[in-house]
Amino acid sequence: GNTASGLETLWQICASLQRLGYPVVVLDGTAQESDDSPGLLHLLQHATWNDGASLNLGATASSLAVIPAAKGLQHLSRKASGSTRSPMESLLPCFRTYGLMVIHAPASTLGPLLTHTATVPLVVMGSGAAGVMTSYKSLKQIALHTGLPCMVAALLHSNTAAERRKAQSQLMTLQACAERHLGGPIRTTTIATQNPQDLQRLALQLLENAGTMNGALAALTPSNLTGMPAHFVRSH
């Protein structure tokens, strides 16, 4: 389904970024931390842990480090209200050894985390009317907290002319809704999931838009992952 293919695309993008020489750590906001599976919350509670050394991230130079982060991200999201600084800055000491951080989390959690940033979040749209609606909800959540302009990408699985036309039509519908109800324009693009060049182009766009943890941030919001955005940020 859309969720599986969207997740696969997310991992492919992360793999492209690693091939470009950026060690990637993924904070999975859909996975709960526990004593058996420690994650972000444990890092935030134990500041003496050095660069995440006490976490078994299971990563090598060629694999992704993925850690549970649902509770930790919710904690940071709550702390964001009323702050004049990006809540992402507090993560820097934990992940200095990584070149790039990916945050995969619900839009309601991610929105507050993007406050005080200068970025262009990228929303990956699923197919059909449901994909348009889910993408719009993600855009609305981000706009509610940040007012940031977004780019929306439609995934093309077979990359036929008919599929491309349908995707373009859905993007135009979403664009019109965003301009009418959210008060701002969005940029759009299409990504053929079976085309390595398209995936690398998207990875490079994310890298280009990503700033530092105390500067500009970039986000990928795959709304077809049942509304689970993923946020990309350089750690240094």
Model-derived segments and spans:
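Inter-motif core of Ras-like GTPase G domains
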Residues: 88-98, 106-129
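Histidine-anchored nucleotide/phosphate-binding helix
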Residues: 8-19, 134-144
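P-loop/Walker-type NTP enzyme "switch/lid" segment
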Residues: 1-5, 19-99, 172, 196-200
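Conserved beta-strand segments of the P-loop GTPase G domain that flank and frequently precede/overlap
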Residues: 1, 26-29, 65-70, 101-106, ...
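Conserved C-terminal guanine-recognition region of P-loop GTPase G domains, centered on the G4
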Residues: 44-54, 132-149
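C-terminal lobe/tail of nucleotide-utilizing enzymes
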Residues: 148-236
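Short acidic, S/G/P-rich loop/turn micro-motifs used as interaction or catalytic elements
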Residues: 2-5, 32-33, 72-76, 107-111, ...
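Short glycine-/polar-rich loops that comprise or flank the Walker A/P-loop
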Residues: 22, 116-120, 145-150
